[in-house]
Design a protein with these regions (language model features):
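Short beta-strand to alpha-helix junction loop
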Residues: 109-127, 139, 222, 292-301, ...
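C-terminal, flexible cofactor-proximal segment of oxidoreductases
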Residues: 7-27, 251-254, 263-264, 408, ...
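Beta1-alpha1 glycine-rich phosphate/pyrophosphate-binding loop at the start
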Residues: 45-49, 54-138, 246-247, 310-312, ...
Length: 531
């Protein structure tokens, strides 16, 4: 199957062969994709996209390319596009996967570093939106509070809070949710005893103060996930010392920030071919290492720990600080570009403490072991709060629907919810790989409905042997805390999630839409046609 996927994709080529690169002019882009221009007062559209981040911009591009007659708008609750890459502003913010796969398939990443910093990624998103005219189809500070579906009208009605707090009503035939999976307003903050006693500053990375001065300060970062391992080395350039306080270790893997093979390909080959080769190299390598780790978890565990030990040098208690209790990919691996965290620890500018917090004190933290950990600044890199669809209330024909009570169809639609798709990327690879496939499949659905005169489509399980599974794809804290809010997966296709790009590509890009599960419907004669 994987070889078949490779042959098909290379035979077909990619849009990159005909699309401009990141540094190409807008004139070349306009020759390939015609930007949709909504009227200023228009509130009724064929498609409404909620969220102007990585996913939403990608969906807009695909609509313009594959469904050029469809009207659409992007409603963004914040004041700027970019989603995650505009929200998080902490030191060192960066990607934790390579930009050749986190970047769009239709627009090559041309930065020298494959592991890119947040501002560069945000520039890439802004440039993409501007280049394809998508920025003209975004309405900022528009928060969708409620979406109500009417089968008799084949229409979604959206209650939206506008820039001035005034309620505005929008409507569409198809609703595409690209609002992420976590609460943008607040991160997860455990309630530790004595927090009010601490005389220093307590900061959550999701609400990073613009002018936080940590020069010469003792900093403690609570957490061991991607945010923590990013913050610690980034802050050592100014801080007196940075300590990462973790309750338990995570798997940490060093990787070069620059991809020498990809950079060589871009130097030697035409850009489209180089983009395809670099992208598929990383896709296949990631799939190989993930599958190998799942088949031989103990071997993968020892390999990862051994590489970390070689980076850290002697004198580090590997069993205590760098040996997790779980297997690789039960939780997402943490990436450190060029081994920056290991270098900071080896140089004595940073340290890892594995313990639990008993209480905050006036001058730092008291740990369960009895140790006192002094701090001037404490950063709580304690994770996210799961919040699907931005907390929007979902109603179908007068019935409130909780996503957690539904099953996920092909990882993008909800059972028995018509004309709604939601982008949710991979947990074991770059988010955009699945986001791109979701956008492509959305366009295939829309075009099929137009060809057949259908008004809406609904994923409906007709197979009694399909059983729901509420187990989240990762055992990470935020996934466990939010598992009841997430749609369940089923025991077999098309309800089962494989977290596998090749399988999803075959299903979403090349597979049939008429799978017996996605039910297409026309408006009844009595309902009449919409004017």
């Amino acid at each position: 199957m994987l070889e078949q996927a490779r042959e098909q994709i290379f035979a077909r080529g990619t849009e990159a062969n005909a699309r401009p690169a990141a540094n190409a002019g807008a004139a070349d882009a306009a020759a390939n994709v015609t930007a949709f221009k909504p009227k200023p007062e228009q509130t009724d559209f064929d498609v409404i996209i909620v969220g102007a981040g990585l996913s939403g911009i990608g969906v807009a591009y695909h609509l313009q390319r594959d469904c050029p007659k469809k009207s659409f708008i992007i409603l963004e609750g914040r004041e700027a596009l970019g989603g995650t890459w505009d929200l998080f502003r902490y030191p060192g913010i960066r990607s934790d996967s390579d930009m050749h796969t986190l970047g769009y398939r239709f627009r090559p990443w041309r930065g020298e570093k494959a592991i890119a910093d947040g501002p560069s990624i945000l520039d890439y998103l802004n440039d993409t939106a501007r280049e394809y005219g998508i920025d003209r189809s975004i309405r900022f500070r528009h928060k969708v509070k409620r979406a109500s579906w009417s089968s008799s009208e084949a229409r979604w009605t959206l209650e939206v809070e506008g820039p001035d707090g005034k309620k505005v009503t929008y409507s569409c035939n198809f609703l595409q949710m690209c609002s992420g999976y976590y609460d943008y307003d607040a991160g997860y903050m455990p309630g530790w005893p004595g927090m009010e006693r601490f005389k220093g500053e307590i900061v959550h990375p999701q609400k990073w103060p613009e002018h936080l001065d940590y020069a010469g300060k003792r900093v403690v970062v609570i957490g061991s996930g991607a945010t923590a391992v990013t913050l610690v080395p980034a802050m050592t350039d100014k801080a007196a010392h940075v300590t990462m306080l973790q309750r338990s270790p995570t798997y940490i893997v060093a990787r070069p920030a620059k991809d020498p093979i990809a950079n060589w390909l871009y130097a030697k080959l035409p850009e489209g071919l180089a983009h395809t080769a670099a992208r598929w190299k990383n896709i296949l390598l990631q799939m190989y290492f993930y599958n190998a780790a799942r088949k031989n978890p103990e071997g993968a565990k020892q390999r990862i720990i051994g590489l970390a030990k070689a980076e850290l040098g002697p004198g580090v208690d590997m069993a205590k600080h760098f040996t997790p209790r779980y297997n690789p990919w039960d939780q997402r691996l943490c990436l450190v570009p060029d081994g920056d965290l290991f270098k900071a620890i080896r140089a004595g500018r940073a340290a890892v403490v594995t313990d639990e917090i008993e209480a905050f004190t006036e001058t730092g933290l008291k740990l369960r072991s009895g140790e006192e950990l002094p701090a001037d600044i404490i950063i709580t890199a304690t994770g996210l709060v799961m919040r699907l669809m931005g907390g929007m209330e979902l109603v179908v024909d007068g019935r409130i629907v909780k996503p957690g009570t539904t099953m996920s169809y092909k990882g993008m639609m909800f059972s028995d919810v018509p004309n709604l798709a939601s982008t949710f990327g991979y947990t074991n690879a770059s988010w955009t790989l699945k986001a791109d496939l979701t956008a492509e499949y959305l366009c295939r659905i829309l075009n099929k409905m137009d060809r057949g005169g259908y008004a809406y489509c609904t994923p409906h399980n007709k197979d009694p042997s399909v059983t729901p599974d509420a187990t989240p794809p990762l055992s990470s804290g935020y996934m466990q805390r939010g598992k009841d809010a997430m749609p369940k997966q089923g025991s077999k296709r098309p309800w089962k999630l494989y977290q596998n790009y090749a399988k999803d590509m075959l299903a979403l890009r090349f597979g049939t839409i008429d799978d017996g599960t996605l039910v297409f419907s026309k408006l009844s004669q009595r309902a009449g046609k919409r004017a």
